[in-house]
Design a protein with these regions (language model features):
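Conserved switch/coupling elements of ABC/ABC-like ATPase nucleotide-binding domains
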Residues: 224-228
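ABC family nucleotide-binding domain
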Residues: 5-223
Length: 228
């Protein structure tokens, strides 16, 4: 059994928002604690409004908990300022959303390389990795195409490659198959599982899809802001 420290630790995480009536705050997450190891694949499921996306945003440093502590690769994220958090996100994390957010004026390869520009110009090694990953997802012949020339499933595969280009330790996906038809969603779900294993990247996906959740090694159910 491995003695390696968890990649990600959440300790007593709560998230509150001001309520419309300005009395009791709206409690979205309530005292949630969790450990996630390197290379795991995890689905976060639960009814709408239970806090799934809020939890994913806190893990991805796009939101801050009201109380509690988040530790990633041994670093207490509350000690980092905005610039340091942005650098950590770019270095350690990749994001996939229901909408691909590709730049329509850029080619497939240019879109894939966007995250590498945070540290200057894309290198030859970046381009080679992008080319290899695009070939891996069956888009090796589409490098010079623009998003408008691709199907919905192809665009989402480009978004997956873009999320992996910087070799992140953590891949966060928010309803990645939500806008796809069933056949395309099935293929993308299997691709995510395969890449999770091939890249040894920890995959955390928020989903309403039972099919996608069943492909993950572990499923976490949120109910009323707590793990069920």
């Amino acid at each position: 059994m491995s003695n390696e420290a968890p990649l990600l630790q959440l300790e007593n995480i709560s998230r509150e928002f001001p309520s419309a009536k300005n009395d009791e705050p709206l409690r979205v997450l309530r005292g949630l604690s969790l450990e996630i190891n390197r290379g795991e694949s995890i689905a976060i499921v639960g009814p709408s409004g239970c806090g799934k996306s809020t939890l994913l945003n806190i893990i991805g440093t796009l939101d801050q908990p009201t109380t509690g502590k988040v530790t990633l690769v041994g670093q207490d994220l509350s000690t980092l300022d905005g610039n340091a958090l942005a650098a950590l996100r770019n270095r350690e994390m990749g994001f996939i959303f229901q909408s691909h957010h590709l730049l329509p004026q850029c080619t497939v390869m240019e879109n894939v390389l966007v995250p590498t520009l945070a540290h200057g110009q894309a290198t030859a090694a970046d381009e080679e990795r992008g080319r290899r990953l695009l070939e891996r997802v069956d888009l090796g012949e589409r490098l010079a195409h623009r998003p408008g020339q691709l199907s919905g499933g192809e665009r989402q595969r480009v978004a997956v490659v873009r999320a992996l280009i910087n070799q992140p330790k953590l891949l966060l996906a928010d309803e990645p198959t939500g806008a796809l038809d069933q056949a395309t969603a099935d293929k993308l779900g299997q691709l995510l599982v395969d890449l999770n294993q091939e890249e040894n990247v920890t995959l955390i996906t928020v989903t309403h899809s039972a099919d996608l959740a069943n492909r993950m090694a572990r499923t976490l159910e949120l109910l009323d802001g707590q793990l069920a």
